[in-house]
């Protein structure tokens, strides 16, 4: 792990050698490492006399630092472990802990910090704190330390429970503070939205009053705003897809002439009408005038009865040789018509 203290990297957590040297407990070694690392002084640091350490920000300490060294981020569990190893809280208003063997730069004293045995484990101890050091000298030192503070085993257990409960309450208070902050921010946002909603009817009524008093001024103001928005859109790069212009529409088709009725033949652009003389039994071709269509090709058109030519005749178009007949109203207004 990066950032290990030099003394810890050199073997702060050692194994028992042949001379019976004890090893430092992993919890104690990791705690010493956290306190000694200058990069974590904003969260935890040494006390004024270098014989204690202070957790400056327990909430950030639990969230950022504890998970890097331990398998949890529970501050109350960390405090409970400190109590198990004989640390005590030395200041009522801040999280400052001390141990007689937890001193800055005195790494050779760390193996003396061991987990205390529960009551009933081990045979000695009398009224003192029952801790095991693996040697008579260590037991004597622990007993002397317990006697110096004047605490029995039951009192130490009670103090441990009180500190654990205090740490748990502190964590709960921190959680409630975070929730309160989040709720306050949400209420502020809702208040802003509510105020904006309440202002809209007043703005609408004011606009309607101005429109009723001077419609031209309001219309001119709206036109100015629209022109300003248009100028802004022209200056800003457009993110809308480019629309290709449509091709021009084809020119309209010229009107189609009426098709000749049955019996007419087209020659050199002039329709010819066939008349039949019943008496002489021969055919005669006369030219017919072609009139452009005045209505769409789908519309129906009428024809006029052509007088009999030489004793007989059929329905057809007007010939050039005959006098033009005046068409009825309203066709006479068009200048030319079907008849």
UniProtKB/Swiss-Prot annotation:
Assigned keywords, A-Z: Coiled coil, DNA-binding, Nucleus, Phosphoprotein, Stress response, Transcription, Transcription regulation
GO biological process: cellular response to heat; regulation of transcription by RNA polymerase II
Motif Nuclear localization signal: chain residues: 229-233
Region feature (Disordered): 227-248
Gene3D superfamilies referenced in this protein's UniProt entry, alphabetically: Winged helix-like DNA-binding domain superfamily/Winged helix DNA-binding domain (1.10.10.10)
Annotated compartments: Nucleus
UniProt region (Hydrophobic repeat HR-A/B), positions on chain: 176-212
GO CC terms, sorted: nucleus
Modification after translation (UniProt): Exhibits temperature-dependent phosphorylation.
Entry text on domains: The hydrophobic-rich region (HR-A/B) corresponds to the oligomerization domain.
Family: Belongs to the HSF family. Class C subfamily.
Subunit organization: Homotrimer.
Entry protein name: Heat stress transcription factor C-1a
Gene this protein is translated from: HSFC1A
């Amino acid at each position: 792990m990066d950032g290990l203290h030099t003394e810890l990297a050199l073997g702060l957590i050692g194994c028992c050698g042949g001379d019976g040297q004890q090893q430092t407990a992993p919890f104690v070694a990791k705690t010493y490492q956290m306190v000694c690392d200058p990069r974590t002084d904003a969260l935890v640091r040494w006390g004024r006399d270098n014989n204690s350490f202070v957790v400056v920000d327990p909430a950030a300490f639990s969230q950022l630092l504890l998970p890097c060294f331990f398998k949890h981020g529970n501050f109350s569990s960390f405090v409970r472990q400190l109590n198990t190893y004989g640390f005590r809280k030395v200041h009522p208003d801040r999280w400052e802990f001390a141990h007689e063997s937890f001193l800055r730069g005195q790494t050779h004293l760390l193996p003396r910090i061991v987990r205390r045995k529960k009551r009933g484990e081990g045979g000695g101890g009398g009224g003192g704190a029952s801790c095991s050091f693996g040697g008579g000298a260590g037991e004597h030192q622990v007993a002397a330390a317990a006697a110096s503070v004047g605490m029995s085993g039951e009192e130490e257990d009670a103090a441990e429970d009180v500190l654990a409960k205090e740490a748990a309450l502190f964590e709960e208070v921190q959680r409630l503070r975070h929730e309160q902050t989040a709720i306050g921010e949400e209420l502020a946002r809702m208040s802003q939205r509510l105020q904006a909603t309440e202002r809209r009817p007043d703005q609408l009524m004011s606009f309607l009053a101005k429109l009723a008093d001077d419609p031209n001024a309001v219309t001119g103001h709206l036109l100015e705003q629209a022109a300003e928005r248009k100028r802004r859109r022209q200056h800003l790069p457009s993110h809308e897809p480019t629309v290709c212009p449509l091709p021009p529409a084809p020119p309209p088709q010229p009107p189609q002439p009426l098709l000749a009725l049955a019996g007419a033949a087209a020659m050199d652009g002039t329709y010819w009408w066939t008349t039949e003389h019943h008496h002489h039994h021969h055919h005669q071709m006369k030219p017919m005038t072609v009139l452009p269509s005045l209505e769409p090709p789908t519309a129906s058109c009428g024809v006029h009865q052509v007088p009999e030519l030489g004793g007989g005749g059929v329905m057809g178009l007007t010939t050039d040789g005959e006098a033009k007949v005046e068409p009825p109203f309203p066709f006479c207004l068009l200048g030319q018509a079907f008849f």
